[in-house]
């Protein structure tokens, strides 16, 4: 019997070698995590077939390592799986021989190299004045008053997928809770970026959706870096949590992070949006076309570029046809860990403005996540100067009438 099992295993390997490799993302060598991969299955695969494939991949991994030197050598094999509507896959650490066989397996759609994900913030300045709230609640620049409806995001839950959030910060008035951590064992914001973005989309003083609930989803470490696979885990947790708790259709997510174009990252972002969560994402800070970055180029998400207080597109903001709207992104003051405040700049700061307005409109107008970005674009004002190629001039506006 063992002979036939061995023969079957060898037959699978031979079949795999007859199929072209489906490794992608190799052209983006920047920030690649060595020997780490994300495997995406074909959309037609059943749950039973997915389980069988995982067992096969793990067996091939163990066999190849055993033939090499008998040690793992940091190559742990299959680590985590993810499942969205029409999208299944897993991530892991494999040697080149194993991942080549996996990529040729008939059940596999493609394999993408795992890469380092970074924040989209660029500068820090302590305790500077903010201007973003006044700007997004008036059709013209110049006012420091924030005009908004008292519903203020009530009944909406916002997932901050970031460096974590200081959930005890007074800005959140008991509305913030810890969700999950896919990057380390420190369930706190050791960087500050996640607390800052959350303060913008839902803080009591510096925020837009002041009555929304906030959930911290930590996918980036103290240095502001993580992995594509770790971010996918975090997004998976959000969609599962929203489903279990009846929050689909009443939830938003902020993604102030990104990498060079990733097919799997875009597909996961699209799946999360389609599951009933409004996604606001940062365009990036490379001063180039945002279509080259993920999740900025994902379909259906609301991609935010950045302006300064004079309504000019910043020199560092990415741009292009994937940008849905501009938002305040230069010198934005917001919450910071340990009851502090700080001022940051970047499309990381524009995105939570869009996320906050999205949550605000969901509560105020009762619109679904799939309609929010269109509504944001409908309300936005044509006021952005220093226009970039093939890019909207629309600036975020909450429709207050001011």
From Swiss-Prot:
GO cellular component terms listed in the entry, alphabetical order: extracellular region
Glycosylation site residues: 254, 390, 398
Q: Where is the active site?
A: 162, 193, 348
UniProt GO MF annotations? serine-type endopeptidase activity
Show the propeptide residue ranges: 21-120
Q: Does the keyword Cytoplasm apply?
A: no
Q: Gene3D superfamilies under this entry?
A: Peptidase S8 propeptide/proteinase inhibitor I9, Peptidase S8/S53 domain
Q: What is the gene called?
A: SUB9
Q: Which organism is it from?
A: Arthroderma benhamiae (strain ATCC MYA-4681 / CBS 112371)
Cell location? Secreted
Q: What is this protein called?
A: Subtilisin-like protease 9
Keyword terms, alphabetized: Glycoprotein, Hydrolase, Protease, Secreted, Serine protease, Signal, Virulence, Zymogen
* UniProt xrefs under PROSITE patterns: SUBTILASE, SUBTILASE_SER
Could you say which EC number(s) this protein's record lists? 3.4.21.-
Please list the GO biological process terms of this entry.
proteolysis
List, for all copies, the residue spans of the domain called Peptidase S8. 130-402
- Write down the Pfam families for this protein, in alphabetical order: Inhibitor_I9, Peptidase_S8
Q: Where would I find the Inhibitor I9 domain in this sequence? A: 36-119
Query: What is this protein for, i.e. what is its function?
Result: Secreted subtilisin-like serine protease with keratinolytic activity that contributes to pathogenicity.
Q: Does the keyword Secreted apply?
A: yes
Signal sequence, start to end:
1-20
Q: What class of enzyme is it?
A: hydrolase
The UniProt entry's sequence similarity note says:
Belongs to the peptidase S8 family.
């Amino acid at each position: 019997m063992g002979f036939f099992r061995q023969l079957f295993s060898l037959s699978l390997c031979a079949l795999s070698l007859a199929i072209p490799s489906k490794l992608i993302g190799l052209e983006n060598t920047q920030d690649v995590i060595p020997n780490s991969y994300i495997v995406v299955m074909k959309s037609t695969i059943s749950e039973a077939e997915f389980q069988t494939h995982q067992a096969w991949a793990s067996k091939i991994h163990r066999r190849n390592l055993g033939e090499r030197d008998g040690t793992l050598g940091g190559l742990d094999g299959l680590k985590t799986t993810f499942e969205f509507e029409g999208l299944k896959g897993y991530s892991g650490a494999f040697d080149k021989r194993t991942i080549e066989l996996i990529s040729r397996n008939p059940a596999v759609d493609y394999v993408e190299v795992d890469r380092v994900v970074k924040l989209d913030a660029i500068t820090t300045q302590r305790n500077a004045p903010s201007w973003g709230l006044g700007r997004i609640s008036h059709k013209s620049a110049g006012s420091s008053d924030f005009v908004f409806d008292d519903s203020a995001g009530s009944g909406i839950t916002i997932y901050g997928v970031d460096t974590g959030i200081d959930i005890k910060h007074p800005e959140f008035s008991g509305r913030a809770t810890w969700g999950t951590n896919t990057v380390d064992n420190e369930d706190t914001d050791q960087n500050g970026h996640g607390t800052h973005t959350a303060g913008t989309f839902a803080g009591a003083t510096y925020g837009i959706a002041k009555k929304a609930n906030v959930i911290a989803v930590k996918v980036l470490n103290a240095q502001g870096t993580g992995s594509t696979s770790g971010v996918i885990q975090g997004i998976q947790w959000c969609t599962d949590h929203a489903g279990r708790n009846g929050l689909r259709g009443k939830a938003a997510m902020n993604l102030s992070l990104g990498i060079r174009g990733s097919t799997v990252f875009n597909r996961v972002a699209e799946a999360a949006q389609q599951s009933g969560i409004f996604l606001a994402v940062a365009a990036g800070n490379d001063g180039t076309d945002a279509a080259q970055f993920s999740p900025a180029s994902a379909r259906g998400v609301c991609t935010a570029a950045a302006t300064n207080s004079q309504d000019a597109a910043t020199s560092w903001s990415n741009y292009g046809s994937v940008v849905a709207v501009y938002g305040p992104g230069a010198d934005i003051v917001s919450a910071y860990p340990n009851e502090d405040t700080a001022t940051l700049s970047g499309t990381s700061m524009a995105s939570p403005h869009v996320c906050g307005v999205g949550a605000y409109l969901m509560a105020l107008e009762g619109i679904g996540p799939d309609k929010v970005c269109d509504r944001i674009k409908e309300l936005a004002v044509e006021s952005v100067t220093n226009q970039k190629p093939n890019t909207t001039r629309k600036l975020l506006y909450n429709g207050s009438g001011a």
